Amino acid sequence: MPRRQPPRPLLLLSALLCAPASAFNLDEEKLTVYSGPPGSYFGYSVDFYIPDPSTVSVLVGAPRANTTQPDIVEGGAVYHCGWPAARCRQIPFDNTNNRKIKVNGTREPIEFKTNQWFGATVKAHKEKVVACAPLYHWRTLKDSPEKDPVGTCYVAIQNFSAYAEYSPCRNSNADPEGQGFCQAGFSLDFYKNGDLIVGGPGSFYWQGQVITASIADIITNYSFKDILRKLAHEKQTGVAPPTYDDNYMGYSVAAGEFTGDSEEELVAGVPRGAQNFGYVSIINSSDLTFIQNFTGEQMASYFGYTVAVSDVNNDGLDDILVGAPLFMEREFESKPKEVGQVYLYLQESAFLFRDPQILTGTEVFGRFGSAITHLGDLNQDGYNDIAVGAPFAGEDRRGKVLIYNGYSNGLKTDPSQVLNGAWASQSMPSGFGFTLRGDSDVDKNDYPDLIVGAFGAGKAVVYRARPVVTVNALLILNPMIVNPDNKTCQPPGSPLFVACFTVRVCAAFEGQSISDEIVLKGELQLDSLKQKGAVKRTLFFDYHQSHHYFSIVMERQKKLYCQDFLVYLRDETEFRDKLSPININLNYSLDESHFKDSLLVKPILNYYQRPSVTEQAYILVDCGEDNLCIPDLHLSAVPDKDQLIIGEENCVMLIINPRNDGEGAYEAELHIKIPPEADYTGVERNNKALRVLSCDYKMENETRMVVCDLGNPMVAGANFSTGIRFSVQHFENSDFSINFELQIKSSNKINSTSNLVNLHINITAAAQVQVRGVSHPPQIILPLHNWEPKDEPTKEEEIGPLVEHIYELHNIGPSAINNTVLHVGWPVSSGEEFLLYILHIQTHGPLHCQTSSPINIMQINFAIPQDTPELAAFLYNSTISHYIRRREVAVAEPYRRNSAKILNCTNVKCILISCNVGQLERGKSAALKIRSRLWAETFLQRKNDPYTLSSNVSFKVKNMPYKVQPAKLPEGSIAIRTSVIWSTPNVSFVIPLWVIILAIMLGLLVLAVLTLALWKCGFFDRARPPQDDMADREQLTNNKTTDA
């Protein structure tokens, strides 16, 4: 059969598939770190070497290390590292060059040790050590340069004084069809009796195989020159049908007992079997027949990448652990995440296992499950524990190791400790946790330790287990029920006596390999359930504080050590809470400063035992012999009004009646949940029938509350009424009612609350809407002075007198209105003759109008007016002055007939003006002004016939801007009238001119005669008194004298 192209070696796949808890009792401070040559992959494999009970050291594989072998490059090595920390030295398993044969007269190598990855696996069993080179190549055909990775192993015994090579797949007929790509030593383990198990996953077109052999057979009669060697008791699994090609059986191996015959079986991982789902086989060690398989749950998860055996639940039966580091977790519809899994199969009896317990990794690409090791009983609790490697998890992919503790039902699902890699590598991840080995005690403290390899960083780390201390602590309170009236203790420096009680702290310890004396650091917290800043009801007698730190020295195991502390109760006026228990809490920890030895690891408290103890004291209350108050709380409430109208200043008072028909209710409070529409305004204080409570506004979980104190306690038989006032204004999103929730709450344990009262107050909307209007002028008097009709008028004055109708829609309230329709019917013509010719429509406020037909169809020129005084006056409720111009000669009263003919939309043609009115709040208006001209010619043709022109306006409110609507929405209508009447002029007489002249002349003659008669009678002469005559004469005489 022709050879297929050899795949990339499987060893590289195992190493590079993913290229790019809190602490418990593995000590992360006192580490032993071994380092190897850079780039050697030191730490790729590790194990403990215990040739005798008194000697423990560490073996570390470095598969890319250089050795002293001539002409061999990076052949790989195994290092022996002493403990305590000592320098590591290479173990000289093989110091030779490649063996050669003569081909056509030339000596050519028959084996190839360069890059053979010696040290990729290493295992020790007592004084025996086996290390393998799975990429060791062998030249099968002497006349062909081709070579095959058959793999080889070396055995060291007698403290590395004797060595033997073991290459079970090296033969003269090696090829892919056979064992040419075997890679023997890819995995490695020992039976308990010391026999060797070797995995060769590349045999038979990568079907894989497992091989077992006795170390004694390998050593006996070994000769370096004996290249092709067959052992008498060697066992190998054979070739399977072609459907098993590329399965990789032997990728991992382990040994355990599963058939109940006390004879161990071997376990082999087959990560690409079962159509790439992977499986693990239990194989009979006697004849290597297959007994049972466990199959993976997900394709390509690499189920079987690693296997381990441990009695996790300590039932005497071995259990199987399987790693699937490429398992991908799918969460809902999110992208799958590669997190890895570990499966635990608990053995219940021979051939019978439970369904697997599954541990799932948490970090993407962390490769959780790449390594699994049995740790032994790490914390000495009677159950074995395991470690799981996630070599590419953590910060910068430095790697993690997770410790899982066993218990009676398997493994605890959360790790008790997570070890983090401390090294980062620029070229590749450090691989911390890629290989693990446990279940050996290097420091002889009776606790097993752990080795972790970090081949990318060239490190191997030994973690030592810390002794576990289990503390049994308790608190004793005397008395547990404190009588606040029994004041027998006087604190230092205080003249007052207080009630007090004793807190006794007792503790004992035990543990494996613990010193005779340990010291606990303790902290006592009084009333620990009270939040920070709250009043602590009890204080230490000597310190007046609610917490105290102290130490307990315990000199030997299992002996109880106690300390007493005196505690007192504050005065009752200093706190409200009398019912809830007084929590006394003890926290403790180990005083590590007490341990002086720098080499020994310090003990640690048991992770699975809470380092705290709690007890509770109670305050004696007046609640009978059982000190348990059981109230019987009742609550009723009514509002002082049944209905709230939107838009009004709604103030509502809740009249509330709390009642207690049982025993005292402590810290009793009335809780009122306020609806969004309401605001708390206060307590009613002016009604003597209502008790005045102390109330506060609060926010509880974003809920607005009013909380009122009802007493501490609210005594038995309490029954009263109180009034709480609210202002209700915010109705934007209100439904048909608002709801207040009321309840009494207390701190009593039983019957702590009253019935819940839901108080509903109905909400309604109501608005009074008024439409009003005016005509300006109210009447037109014909005929018009100095006006002549024109056949084709172009200016508005040529049509006739101005007529304006003004309409206002006014919301009196209290609620707002929205979406109102306003209609105006306007008498525009009768037959072919115009009546009122519309020039312009003007609006004010949230009003949008349109007409049923065009206006000003004759394109009459007009000036667009601003708000006229009469419109402004109308809108602001002022008196509208009508200035009616009368004809100068028309001074008589208008001529009226008994009745005027009414012209409206019932008998003439009208234009319909439709308006949509927006939201009008209380007291707001919208107005419409129609500016028109009376078509005078139409009426002058009907001389002396009076008319009344009537426009009709109506409105209807469609809805209000609230969720709640009134039963009937406002609507109404009115008519605005303009009268057209005729004047009747007074009769006038013409006087001739000569009559006027004659009348003037006669008048002047009469005036002259009258004047002459009066003069003749002395009417114009002035009579003087005698004294005045004398004075005048004296004055005259004096003047004359002076002149002289």
UniProtKB/Swiss-Prot annotation:
Spans traversing the lipid bilayer: 992-1015
Keyword Transport among UniProt keywords: no
GO biological process: cell adhesion mediated by integrin; cell differentiation; cell-cell adhesion; integrin-mediated signaling pathway; nervous system development
Residues binding Ca(2+) 4: D441, D443, N445, Y447, D449
Cytoplasmic-facing ranges: 1016-1044
One Gene Ontology term of the molecular function aspect: metal ion binding
The name this protein goes by in its record: Integrin alpha-8
Native organism: Gallus gallus
